[in-house]
Amino acid sequence: MKIRIKIKLILASTLLSSSVLASGELHLDHANTNISDTASLQNGAKLFMNYCSGCHAISFMRYNRIAQDLNLSDSLVAQHLMFAGEKPGETITTAMPEEGAAKWFGGTPPDLSLVARAKGTDWVYTYLRGFYKDDSKVFGVNNK
């Protein structure tokens, strides 16, 4: 049941983003990405695990695959990216309980495994750059 809902959400977001992009209503900043820049990718993994993984899962990724893709040893990944005794072959889930997510956010924050593939790196870059300080919000930030 949960898998069907996730698939529907991914498909809906893909269709929605495609229709918005086709209509020309959304300007996307260009993400100057370089998938060969291993140091930058390692930094991105560190930032995600430190700032995003508390709420967002990337359940189609495994810790040992991140180690392999980023030329890191399993011990380095365990030391710097695994915080709750996970095993290298496990998928990356969030520690946030669903009932807490519903209470705090009105729903479970989306799994980010396929966002860049579904919406594109320019969309992700634009979205992340859209955050600003907003003291009226619970977490002190908001997004355009």
Residue ranges and their predicted role:
Residues 1-35:
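Post-cleavage N-terminal segment of exported redox proteins
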Residues 62, 70-73, 130, 142:
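Residue-level signal for alpha-helical context at structural boundaries
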Residues 121-144:
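Extracytoplasmic/lumenal ectodomains and periplasmic regions of secretory and membrane proteins
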Residues 66-103, 107-109, 115:
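Structured domain cores in non-transmembrane regions
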